[in-house]
Amino acid sequence: ASGLWQLTPAIAKYFNVQISPWYDGRQDVIDSTRAALDFMEYLHTRFDGDWYHAIAAYNVGEGRVKRAIRNNKKQGKPTDFFNLKLPKQTSQYVPKLLAAAQLLKSNKMAFPAINNQQAIATLPISGAVMLDSQQEWQSLEPLNYGVIRFPAIIDAPHIVVPVNKLAEFQGML
C-alpha cells in the first residue's frame, strides 16, 4: 500500500488511479483522495450500510471482514464489528477513528482559524512536460508526490500548482 490513503495497486487500478514508472497516482493527493472516497462508498454499500464493517474492511480487506462475519454466523454469534475476530490492528483502528471523529464533532479540540481560500489548482496535462528550471520543479515537487521523476512529468493526468502561479504555469505548458 502507498500514499496518504494507503491504496494497494489492485484497489488503485479498480478505482482508476494511474500507476506507471513515471507517475503513481496513489501518491497524488487529489487522485488518491477521490479513489479512497470511492472505495469507502463501495465498501459501505457492500456491507449493507454498516460503517464499522466498511471501515474495518478498508483497513484489513473486504474478504477478511466477510469471512469473519460468515464464521460468526456459522457459530451463532453476533456479526457486529465488536464481536468479529479480526486482527488487533483492525480491532483498534475502528475505535480510534471513531474517537477522532467524535473529538472533531464535539468541538472539544481547538483549531486555529484558517483562511478558507483555494490554495492549489490542478492543471491538466497530456503527454510529457519537462520543467526547465530547478526553481520551477522545486516549487512543484512538494505538491506533486505522484510524479516520480521530476523534472520530467510523464503519464500524469495533471499537475498541482499554487493557485497564485496558475497563469504562469498555464503559459509554460
Protein language model features and the residues they cover:
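Extracytoplasmic and endomembrane cell-envelope/extracellular-matrix remodeling and assembly machinery
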Residues: 14, 19-22, 26-47, 52-56, ...
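Short, surface-exposed glycine/acidic/tryptophan-bearing loops
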Residues: 1-16
